Structures are given as structure tokens and as C-alpha cells.
């Protein structure tokens, strides 16, 4: 625009010269990558736990699916005594610490 007051006739609508066709830092071309689809997903393994209820000592069987790391972490919690299981009968009487 030129002049003290802007007018519609003074607007320059040709902006092609302002847009650069390439990146100034590099001329690399991004290849479409399918890394997400090519990366193998971790396999879920079925795992059965046979134990007893923490409160009434009745048999409890749990089947779960987890990745290998998840199974190892769960096993460590059980062995350390930081995780125990409860049967459905005892679970009905629990009130989440209330």
C-alpha cells in the first residue's frame, strides 16, 4: 500500500513472489514413510494365574493377556507381596476403603 490512507486499489494481491518454493535450510524431500505400519506390535500373550483369595483363601483363577514386559512386572508385584487377589464373594463386601 502506498499513501497515508489505505485503499482497495492499493492492495497488491500477487503474493507468489513472497512464497519460497523450497526450504532455505535444506532441500531435503520427505519420503512418505510407513514406519507406524511396519513396526511390529508387541504380541499379547495369554497368562493364567491360579492363586487363593487374600481374605478367605478360596481358589481364584484369573486369565489375562499382556505383553512380556507386563507379565514380568505383574510377576514381580505378586512375588514381592505388593499385589494380591480377591474372590468375587469377598469383593462384594469390600467398599474401597470406606
UniProtKB/Swiss-Prot annotation:
Residues 1-42 are annotated as: E7 terminal domain. Keywords: Activator, DNA-binding, Early protein, G1/S host cell cycle checkpoint dysregulation by virus, Host cytoplasm, Host nucleus, Host-virus interaction, Inhibition of host innate immune response by virus, Inhibition of host interferon signaling pathway by virus, Interferon antiviral system evasion, Metal-binding, Modulation of host cell cycle by virus, Oncogene, Transcription, Transcription regulation, Viral immunoevasion, Zinc, Zinc-finger. It comes from the Viruses. GO terms for biological process: DNA-templated transcription; symbiont-mediated perturbation of host cell cycle G1/S transition checkpoint; symbiont-mediated suppression of host innate immune response; symbiont-mediated suppression of host type I interferon-mediated signaling pathway. Its main location: host cell. InterPro entries: Papilloma_E7. It is found in: Host cytoplasm; Host nucleus. Plays a role in viral genome replication by driving entry of quiescent cells into the cell cycle. Stimulation of progression from G1 to S phase allows the virus to efficiently use the cellular DNA replicating machinery to achieve viral genome replication. E7 protein has both transforming and trans-activating activities. Induces the disassembly of the E2F1 transcription factor from RB1, with subsequent transcriptional activation of E2F1-regulated S-phase genes. Interferes with host histone deacetylation mediated by HDAC1 and HDAC2, leading to transcription activation. Homodimer. Homooligomer. Interacts with host RB1; this interaction induces dissociation of RB1-E2F1 complex thereby disrupting RB1 activity. Interacts with host EP300; this interaction represses EP300 transcriptional activity. Interacts with protein E2; this interaction inhibits E7 oncogenic activity. Interacts with host TMEM173/STING; this interaction impairs the ability of TMEM173/STING to sense cytosolic DNA and promote the production of type I interferon (IFN-alpha and IFN-beta). This is Protein E7. It comes from Human papillomavirus 65.
Amino acid at each position: 500500500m502506498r499513501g497515508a490512507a489505505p485503499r482497495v486499489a492499493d492492495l497488491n494481491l500477487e503474493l507468489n513472489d513472497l512464497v519460497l518454493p523450497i526450504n532455505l535450510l535444506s532441500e531435503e524431500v520427505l519420503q512418505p514413510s510407513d514406519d507406524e505400519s511396519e513396526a511390529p506390535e508387541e504380541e499379547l500373550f495369554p497368562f493364567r494365574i491360579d492363586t487363593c483369595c487374600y481374605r478367605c483363601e478360596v481358589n481364584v483363577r484369573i486369565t489375562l493377556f499382556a505383553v512380556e514386559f507386563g507379565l514380568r512386572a505383574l510377576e514381580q508385584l505378586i512375588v514381592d507381596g505388593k499385589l494380591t487377589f480377591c474372590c468375587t464373594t469377598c469383593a462384594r463386601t469390600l467398599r474401597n476403603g470406606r
